[in-house]
Amino acid sequence: MKQVLNGSEIVLECLKEQGVDTVFGYPGGAILNIYDELYKQSDKIHHVLTSHEQGASHAADGYARATGKVGVCMATSGPGATNLVTGLATAYMDSIPVVAITANVGVSLLGKDSFQEIDIKGVTMPVTKHNYIVKDIEKLADTIREAFQIAQSGRKGPVLVDITKDVTAAKTYFESMEPAVIHPVCETIKEKSVKEAIEMIEAAKQPYVLLGGGCTLSDASEQVREFVKKIDAPVCDTLMGKGVFPGEDPAYTGMLGMHGTKTSNIGVSQSDLLIAIGTRFSDRVYGNAKTFASRAKIIQIDIDPAEVNKNILIDTAIIGDVKAVLTILNRRLSQQQHEAWMQEIQDMKAKYPMTYHQERLSGPGLIEKIYELTEGDAIITTEVGQHQMWAAQYYKYERPRQFLTSGGLGTMGYGLGAAIGAKCGCPDKVVVNIAGDGCFRMNMNEIATATRSEIPVIEVVVNNHVLGMVRQWQNLFYGERYSSTTLYDKVDFVKLAEAMGAKAKRVETIKEFEAAFKEAVASNEPYLLDCIIDSDDKVWPMVAPGGSISDAFNEEDLEKQKQEESK
């Protein structure tokens, strides 16, 4: 039934059509009409007031990653809108469905350098899948509906809708509609490519499977697990592919690439077939393109044809939705057996275990303890740096949408906002953000968001008083010249958190951490744990920049090299 509504009412009606129940944002002058309507309909759509618009964009991203639904954030014109840019770029790089709604000055004020006027459509063009500016009330509803459809279809991504203030107040006829059904973009998967892939898989003696974030975005975890059993192959993943395949499964060998396990890096280098599923072959994964998987033929399965042969030359590509492609392959492939190869991989895992210093508090030790105390069931978000790699290496993820991190853009300050979004979307899960002390400083104000909105996230600060990952590179490749990476100062994170209304404790031993973490979970309140570790702790293994992944080295290898050089 048609009814006369103003633009702000239409925005809310369109959000409800799409099943939106939570919005993250920060108000301002240009968007006041929409916020007035949010107030009137607060029983239908919950608005989380963040401490900064960037926090809102990360929260929408975290909500989307944790739930599989579209995350929604809002901001006013000018600096409010530009503060969303880093979060939109983060979502864009990782193909996360987010819809950002911003308001702009009235149509008559556009192009006149008006107060808080900005061409946010132009600004966000490189970091959104699509964007709009709505200057006509008659186009508002269709634009918002289309934005949601674009964000979710094909290769997912963020979409921005900028609405002039006069449109939010204007009135027109509105008729509610059912949301459009999202169909895979590539409905016809090429038979020739499928046949080639099947022939290559059935001819392989030493196949390896590489899983990326596209498997999660396609909700293809079940099909992936069936496929791996069907072809009897070892499995590695990218940072974005965590949880698609269970971390406790014997076939799983860990992450591939710069900080991947030696087993994955050496195993892929010795394979005769690499099946890359839903991954874009980031430089952090392949290392040296010329030597990457040089013995192997490569099959790439991806929804986006632009990713084929972009970084790594492949032999066969199947373009299509990962879930749809694997469903076909699982139906048509015969059962494979690779006992000798699988045993070789198990021997490799025994030869190259992941180790760390257990006599003191350390990043890996913290992650393993969190895994133990949460029984592997928590949602883990991270910032970016050493702690991010430790969280990827030492928490054994059993399901998709359990590990939320900024993979492509590498955004420091992402994790706390993402944790807030994830907890809003999955209130029954324990949500833990793993942060470094450098990252915590970026968006620490979102602790106030958690306390104000009573969102019980746990913030674990892995505090080594340095910018750990940058310092690691300075130590290994820049002659130990530690330029601007030392953070020894008088900032007290515990007092900061307490000042914002959260509970907090500082811990210096694993025993102290265990007791404090249990208390944090039991409190069901925002809680910060300041965990003091050694400044010299490093992420191992490591591949030197530009090096071959087969040359991954660890601390022992480095010591042997130093001893040989000193002879």
Where are the language model's segments positioned?
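Hydrophobic, well-ordered secondary-structure elements that form the walls
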Residues: 298, 370, 382, 421, ...
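Catalytic phosphate/nucleotide-handling subdomain of diverse soluble enzymes
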Residues: 414, 418-456, 462
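Active-site diphosphate/adenylate-binding microenvironment
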Residues: 8-12, 16-21, 29, 34-39, ...
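A short acidic, glycine-rich active-site loop
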Residues: 48, 183-187, 406-409, 479-488, ...
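Active-site nucleophile and cofactor-binding loops and adjacent substrate-binding regions
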Residues: 26-28, 47-58, 73-80, 135-136, ...
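Phosphate/pyrophosphate-binding active-site segments
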Residues: 138, 199, 295-386, 510-511, ...
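Thiamine diphosphate
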Residues: 116, 452-545
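N-terminal alpha/beta PP-like core and its mobile active-site loop of ThDP/TPP-dependent enzymes
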Residues: 1-333, 369, 373-376, 456-459, ...
